[in-house]
Every structure is written in structure tokens, then in C-alpha cells.
């Protein structure tokens, strides 16, 4: 879609919805993910939807703790809650399913006017099988663990368990069947299949059945998809044969679970990945083997076509590495979703870069109100008794979401049209540029509100960022925090930027822009200075002189 047409399309897309509005009890189309020229959108109630979410802590999805999960959405200005569904609870007795907790979460989500993404903690949770029911854990002959290269049993499920696969398929299918009837409002917009599947403590399974298959030939569809010559796993993949074989075993297992659920209710399904270092990946064994890490993305796509996307869980705070992960998972055939990221303050500003790279959703982990903190990655203030309430503890994320949530639908529609750019402050580079057809947007960090004779020094901490939407060839929607935004014409070095109008305002529920004041004078003479907090949105019209 051309930028000039975007404003018209935006109004049509948003006539009936605000970004966090929960649907009424009427028929709504099933959420889906659409692709337009390799730009993606999650469609909810027939319109593009940007997921500004958070994930509950692993043990928070119990009724006694609902009051510490769903109220966090309002504090954060989030429109989506991610929460686990525990196989061990759903099927405590084999063949008998209890979805009362799921129903309770749906009711809570509707009451708090948010959508949900459910996480099926089935065969895998972080490489282990700790959420399988007790009747599975107690029968290890029928439901075996993986055996590693030293012949030792490790705390990771073997894919060579037809009984466990069958049980997982039935359990996940039962969940999706229940959602089909229990959620006509489409409160649930996506479902994650398993959680960070892979192997810790080994490279691949060495059980006799696995050894037999490893000695066999690589499946033809994988060879063809990767453009390789046929042969055994060792012949085709060499030093990476063990890890690639394990990835195929896991991916084909997950595909059968996903397909069983999708046959019941075709919501968008995805898997999440525990990452290896995107710049210095190391050897297999230093990261979760067989997982949907960057080198295995194409394999998982081939093996598991029932999945809508493969998503990275990003717990790497360094700017260069964070952006490298986004580059690895943002593909022409893989929508970008960040379903987990760290909850330390440094992670908050990455929402700007994620949206600018076309993400359909962003969700920090563990931002409920239980005061639990995964200290290696998390906000220590979660458990700090001196913190002044949940608003203080969640403030870095709430600050950015407060700006973005009112325009979440607009951003989603603009991203589908390819008209969004965004960036997050890099502590090593205090200026950044964003490219549009006729203009370059110039971002500077650490400048005062007045004057252009000072060199940008960066913010401390580096928490700035901006998102810019092209509304036309010379018109932009600008939002951000702790950043100065200016524009440079691209095709005539003799020309300089001139602001025709800088309007501060907001969109109403129908997508119509409402101006509250016009910026000029000190507010525009040195570019557009956006504070470290606040919800200022600017509609900017440009020309040259």
C-alpha cells in the first residue's frame, strides 16, 4: 500500500474498534495472520492488531493468583496477557480434561478488556517435561527420557515415545476444541505449542530407535527444501548432523501436536525458541540442542507447516545482539513476534525497534504482580519492599506502552502496509537514521530541548526510542521517548527541511485524528524533542526550502 493511501485505509480499518476493546458476544472472525508483500499483521475482529503484551510468571496461572496477573494489564497499558495452560492440571487423570482454569482466565481477560495468548506447557517446558501429568512422569518405560551421547538419561523427553505423542496430541486437541466452543468472543488470539522445546544435557537422542533413524537417509522433503544432496544424516550435514537430526525429531513431533489442535480450531499457532548467541553461537551443547534456533528455522518450517511462525525469546540485553536476533527471525516467510523478552528496564525500549521491524507482538516476561523476579534477567525491584507499588516496578514498560497502546491498531495497519520505521537507542551510537522514500528521519539521543550546537551524548541509561509512520510522501506520525527527531530531504543536498505543520494530538475510536495544539517556535526550531515519558504524538507535514 502506498503511504499516500494509508490514512484512508486506516480509518476504514478502525471504525469499530479501539486497541484494547474486548469484543461483544457476537460472531467474530477467527484471528489469523495475513501477509501482504512480506509484511504481516495479526488480524483480530477483522482488523490488524498489534499485541502489546506481557507474560505471567510460570506458576501464576492459578485462580488464587488471577488478581495478581490481570490487573497488571491496566498498569502496563497492555492489551494482551500471555499465560500458560498446564498439561499436568488439565489432564491430571488420563483421558479426563479439566478446563475450569482456562475458563477462569477467559473470564478475567474479558473483565479486564484484554486479549490472551495461551501457552501450552505440554511435552516441553524449557527443554524438560516438568509439566507432563504425574501418570506420565511415573511410567518412564512408556514415556522415556532422552539418552545422550554418554549413554546417560537426561532431563529431557525422548521424541521416541508414541504414547506421549499420542497423549499430547489428544490433550492439545482437547484444549483447542474447548476454546472453539468456550470462546466465541475470540478472546484468545494465538496459542503457543509447547515451550522452548529442545535438549539440555545432550546433543541428540541415542536411544536404539534414534540410532536406527540417524543411520538412515534424510527425508527427501528436507533435502529438497535446503537444496542439498541426498544421503544419511552424517553425509548430508557433517559436523551438524547430530543437532540437525534432533531438531527434525522435535519439529516433526510438534507438527503432529499442532496439526491435531489446528484441526479442532485454526487459531494462529507458533513455537518459541531459547536462543543461542546470535553473533558468537558456540558449539552444540552450549545452547539448547535441536531447538528452533536461527540455523534451524527453515528446518522447522519444513517439518511443521501447521505453525504460523517461529518466535525468539530474547534475553540478551546488548543492542547489537538484540537487533541481530530480530534480523535472524524477521524473514519474508516468518512474521516477527517477540513472545518473551527480559523484564529488566533495559529491555523496555526495544519495543520501538521491534515495531519498526514489523513485529506483530511484543511481551516482556514475568510482569505480573506476584513480586517474583527471575533475578538473572529480571527487574530486582519486583521483590524490593522499598519500591513504591506496582506502578514503580513496571514503570519502564508502562511508560512505553502508554504511548503505543492508543495507536496499536494504527501501527498494526501501517506495518501491514510497510509504512512503519522504528529504532531503539544504541549505547554505542548516539544517532540513528530511518529511511523513507523521500525523507530520512534523524534520531539523536542525549540532547537538550534547545539548540543544535551540542553533540549527542546519549541517554543514561540508554532508554530512548522512536516509531515513525509514513502517512503520505511528506507526512508522518511521530512518537517516541527520550529522543530528538528531525528530517532530512534525500534527493537534493541544497534543500533543507521546513515544517509545514507539527500537530500534537491523538486518534479517536474511529481512527480520526484530533489536534490539541500546534507546535512551533522553540518546540520545532531544533527538531522535535520527545520527553523521557508521556504520550505525545505528533502529526508532521514537511516541505523544503
Functional labels for PLM-detected ranges:
Residues 7-15:
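Bacterial N-terminal signal peptides
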Residues 21-79:
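N-terminal carbohydrate-binding accessory modules
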Residues 59-75, 285-303, 321-322, 348-351:
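Short, acidic/polar
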Residues 65-140, 250-266:
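Aromatic-lined substrate-binding rim segments of carbohydrate-active enzymes
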Residues 114, 256-267, 295-400:
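Catalytic-core region of carbohydrate-active enzymes that cleave or remodel glycosidic bonds
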Residues 142-299:
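Polysaccharide-binding and catalytic clefts of secreted carbohydrate-active enzymes
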Residues 352-489:
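Aromatic- and carboxylate-lined catalytic core of secreted/periplasmic carbohydrate-active enzymes
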Residues 441, 445-466, 474-545:
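C-terminal beta-sandwich/jelly-roll accessory domains of carbohydrate-active enzymes
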Amino acid at each position: 500500500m502506498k503511504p499516500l493511501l494509508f490514512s484512508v485505509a486506516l480509518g476504514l480499518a478502525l471504525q469499530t474498534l479501539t486497541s484494547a476493546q474486548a469484543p461483544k458476544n457476537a460472531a467474530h472472525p477467527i484471528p489469523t495472520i495475513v501477509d501482504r508483500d512480506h509484511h504481516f499483521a495479526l488480524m483480530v475482529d477483522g482488523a490488524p492488531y498489534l499485541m502489546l503484551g506481557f507474560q505471567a510468571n510460570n506458576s501464576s496461572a492459578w485462580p488464587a493468583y488471577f488478581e495478581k496477573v490481570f490487573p497488571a494489564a491496566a498498569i502496563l497499558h497492555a492489551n494482551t496477557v500471555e499465560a500458560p495452560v498446564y498439561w499436568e492440571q488439565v489432564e491430571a487423570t488420563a483421558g479426563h480434561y479439566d478446563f475450569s482454569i482456562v475458563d477462569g482466565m477467559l473470564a478475567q481477560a474479558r473483565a479486564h478488556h484484554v486479549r490472551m495468548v495461551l501457552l501450552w506447557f505440554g511435552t516441553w517446558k524449557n527443554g524438560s517435561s516438568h509439566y507432563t501429568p504425574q501418570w506420565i512422569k511415573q511410567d518412564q518405560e512408556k514415556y522415556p527420557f532422552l539418552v545422550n551421547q554418554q549413554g546417560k538419561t537426561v532431563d529431557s523427553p525422548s521424541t521416541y515415545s508414541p504414547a506421549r505423542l499420542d497423549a499430547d496430541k489428544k490433550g492439545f486437541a482437547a484444549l483447542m476444541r474447548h476454546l472453539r466452543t468456550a470462546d466465541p468472543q475470540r478472546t484468545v488470539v494465538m496459542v503457543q505449542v509447547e515451550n522452548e522445546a529442545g535438549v539440555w544435557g545432550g546433543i541428540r537422542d541415542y536411544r536404539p530407535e534414534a540410532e536406527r533413524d540417524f543411520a538412515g537417509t534424510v527425508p527427501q522433503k528436507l533435502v529438497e527444501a535446503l537444496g542439498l544432496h541426498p544421503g544419511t544424516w552424517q553425509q548430508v550435514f557433517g559436523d551438524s548432523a547430530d543437532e540437525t537430526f534432533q531438531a527434525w525429531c522435535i519439529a516433526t513431533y510438534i507438527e503432529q501436536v499442532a496439526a491435531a489442535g489446528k484441526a479442532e480450531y485454526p487459531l494462529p499457532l507458533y513455537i518459541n525458541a531459547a536462543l543461542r548467541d546470535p553473533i558468537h553461537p558456540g558449539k552444540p551443547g552450549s545452547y539448547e540442542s535441536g531447538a528452533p534456533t536461527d540455523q534451524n528455522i527453515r528446518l522447522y518450517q519444513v517439518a511443521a507447516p501447521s505453525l504460523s511462525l517461529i518466535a525468539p525469546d530474547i534475553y540478551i540485553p546488548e543492542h547489537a545482539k538484540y537487533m541481530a536476533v530480530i534480523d535472524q527471525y524477521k524473514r519474508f516467510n516468518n512474521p516477527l513476534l517477540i513472545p518473551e523478552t527480559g523484564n529488566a528496564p533495559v529491555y523496555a525500549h526495544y519495543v520501538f525497534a521491534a515495531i519498526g521491524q514489523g513485529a506483530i507482538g511484543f511481551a516482556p516476561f514475568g510482569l505480573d504482580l506476584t513480586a517474583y523476579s527471575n533475578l538473572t534477567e529480571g527487574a530486582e525491584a519486583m521483590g524490593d519492599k522499598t519500591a513504591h507499588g506496582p506502578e514503580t516496578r513496571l514503570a519502564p514498560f508502562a511508560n512505553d506502552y502508554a504511548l503505543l497502546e492508543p495507536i496499536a491498531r494504527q501501527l498494526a495497519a501501517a506495518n501491514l502496509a510497510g509504512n512503519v520505521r522504528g529504532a531503539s537507542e544504541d549505547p554505542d551510537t548516539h544517532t540513528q537514521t530511518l529511511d523513507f522514500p523521500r525523507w530520512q528521519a534523524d534520531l539523536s539521543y542525549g540532547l537538550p530541548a534547545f539548540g543544535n550546537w551540542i553533540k549527542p551524548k546519549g541517554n543514561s541509561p540508554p532508554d530512548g526510542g522512536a516509531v515513525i509512520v509514513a502517512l503520505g510522501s511528506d507526512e508522518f506520525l511521530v512518537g517516541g521517548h527520550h529522543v530528538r527527531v528531525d528530517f532530512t530531504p534525500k534527493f537534493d543536498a541544497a534543500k533543507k527541511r521546513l515544517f509545514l505543520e507539527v500537530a500534537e494530538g491523538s486518534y479517536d475510536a474511529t481512527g480520526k485524528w484530533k489536534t490539541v495544539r500546534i507546535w512551533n517556535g522553540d518546540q520545532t526550531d531544533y527538531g522535535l524533542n520527545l520527553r523521557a515519558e508521556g504520550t505525545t504524538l505528533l502529526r508532521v507535514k514537511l516541505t523544503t526550502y
